[in-house]
Amino acid sequence: MSIFIIAEIGINHNGDIKIAKDLINVAKESGCDAVKFQKRTIDIVYTKELLDSLRESPWGKNQRAQKEGLEFGFEEYKEIDRYCKELGIDWFASAWDLESQKFLSQFNSKYNKIASAMLTYEPLLQEIASEKKHTFISTGMSNVKNIDRAVQIFKEAECPFELMHCISTYPMEDEDANLNCIKTLRDRYRCNVGYSGHEVGLAVSYAAAALGITSLERHISLDRAMYGSDQSASLEPAALRMLVGAIRKIEKAMGDGNITINEKEIPISKKLRAHFHHVD
């Protein structure tokens, strides 16, 4: 089964639909299977005190201006939906509150996503599980008890899901990846397991692919120097193309695990073993 590669646009569009479409183009041209966004209802997710606090940004001088500037509304998501259908690439989004999930459900995307930060928000998990769409569940900032409960909710709802091993640091240091958790999750929950990476570079993602992940999510950016907290942990277009190309090569290289003589080895074997006239 081919690894399902998700290009996480998140909020790296900076509230600009043109940037969003440029990033969708990059994902499609690179061979990704889907793009993902993030959706928040600002007055639910953040406190009034935080929203009123000072923060310089391209949209104003407080946190509210910055948070609202990064959010897309109905018209933008309608255009994203239309554009992705035109290009033939799936899209979906991770909701950070119930209202946002209900908003997203009107677009009837094929997939849902539980962000690591939301894994312990049971009402949201129950709402998403009730939709019975294939759901990617990131496990960053979570312990076994947290993940057990999330899995229980999805199993009770009979909603298809896969876990995504994740370390929620931005960017993540390679030595923090703990990729052996991929096998731990697979063995404990008897489900498909993917990897959601926030590292700089590609080596950790390649290693995850070799460990048998079924999905891979990486943030993408037009330019890592652009404004935004997620840009530094993102892949620019050239790196994304390199990632997807290498992942597809790794998939082919893994093989089926059967120990046999490759047909291409036979003439070489005859030549190199001719002096003792034996070919296995």
Model regions: which residues?
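Catalytic cores and adjacent flexible loops of soluble metabolic enzymes
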Residues: 1-280
